[in-house]
């Protein structure tokens, strides 16, 4: 099976890594719209337009499935993509919510959703969790994390200052939903900041389990072939994959 993975930039590499390590697919084509990142500050119509253009890009590869590894795109463009695509299209929000439900059986536990401004504004996570009976949900736009990841800043004083700024009035949550696929790249730093009490919900791990339960996919005895594309500076994208995620070998 050949699948496509789409993200606004390099953040979706966190989802790609989980899909790659799960050995569910024969070939994975990753496309990052790095020329127009971030999506989280753009309006709905623009996000849909960019996502439909990405869908057109994937048509040349004859993929069997498309994973939208971008929470903002999943929040605003999933219906439009499904209406146009001739193959299954999955977003990461349903998977993230499902993973949270599995992780937190006590619905009075505290949940913190961090994401781009657009994803928080969509209230997709908040509405879905409230509908499942969760009562203690905070949502916080932490958009500065996106360009930091794009620039390869995964730890250090600058990130520490940003976390202290964003989380200064936040009590330690029981679950932290990383509702932007850039944010798992900051996972080690976020775990260190909040401590062992906080369970991190990772879009990549969540989508793997989500797909296993919904698609008839056999485990492969080989790892998938990877192909990387970007709307600008594909070498930088490949470098991030190689250095941080260890996806590419020299």
Swiss-Prot record:
InterPro entries: Asp/Glu/hydantoin_racemase, Asp/Glu_race, Asp/Glu_racemase_AS_1, Asp/Glu_racemase_AS_2, Glu_race. Signal peptide: none annotated. The active site is at residues 70, 180. GO terms for molecular function: glutamate racemase activity. It holds the Pfam family Asp_Glu_race. Its EC number is 5.1.1.3. Pathway: Cell wall biogenesis; peptidoglycan biosynthesis. Keywords: Cell shape, Cell wall biogenesis/degradation, Isomerase, Peptidoglycan synthesis. One of its GO terms (biological process) is regulation of cell shape. Substrate binds at residues 7-8, 39-40, 71-72, 181-182. It catalyses: L-glutamate = D-glutamate. Provides the (R)-glutamate required for cell wall biosynthesis. Belongs to the aspartate/glutamate racemases family. This is Glutamate racemase. It comes from Campylobacter jejuni subsp. jejuni serotype O:2 (strain ATCC 700819 / NCTC 11168). The lineage of its organism: Bacteria, Pseudomonadati, Campylobacterota, Epsilonproteobacteria, Campylobacterales.
């Amino acid at each position: 099976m050949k699948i496509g993975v789409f993200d606004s930039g390099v953040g979706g590499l966190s989802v790609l890594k989980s899909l790659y390590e799960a050995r569910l697919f024969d070939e994975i084509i990753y496309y990052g719209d790095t020329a127009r990142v971030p999506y989280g500050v753009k309006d709905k119509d623009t996000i849909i337009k960019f996502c439909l253009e990405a869908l057109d890009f994937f048509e040349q590869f004859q993929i069997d499935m498309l994973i939208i590894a971008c929470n903002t795109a999943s929040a605003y463009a999933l219906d439009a993509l499904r209406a146009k695509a001739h193959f299954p299209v999955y977003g990461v929000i349903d998977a993230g919510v499902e993973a949270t439900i599995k992780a937190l059986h006590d619905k009075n536990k505290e949940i913190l959703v961090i994401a781009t401004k657009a994803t928080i504004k969509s209230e997709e996570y908040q509405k879905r969790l409230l509908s499942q009976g969760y009562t203690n949900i905070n949502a916080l736009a932490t958009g500065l994390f996106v360009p930091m990841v794009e620039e390869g800043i995964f730890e250090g004083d600058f990130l520490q200052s940003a976390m202290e700024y964003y989380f200064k009035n936040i009590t330690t949550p029981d679950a932290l939903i990383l509702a932007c696929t850039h944010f798992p790249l900051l996972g080690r730093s976020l775990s260190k900041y909040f401590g062992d009490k906080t369970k991190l919900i990772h879009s990549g791990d969540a989508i793997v389990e989500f797909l296993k339960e919904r698609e008839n996919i056999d485990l492969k005895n080989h790892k998938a072939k990877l192909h990387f594309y970007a709307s600008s500076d594909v070498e930088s994208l490949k470098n991030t994959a190689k250095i941080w995620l260890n996806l590419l070998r020299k």
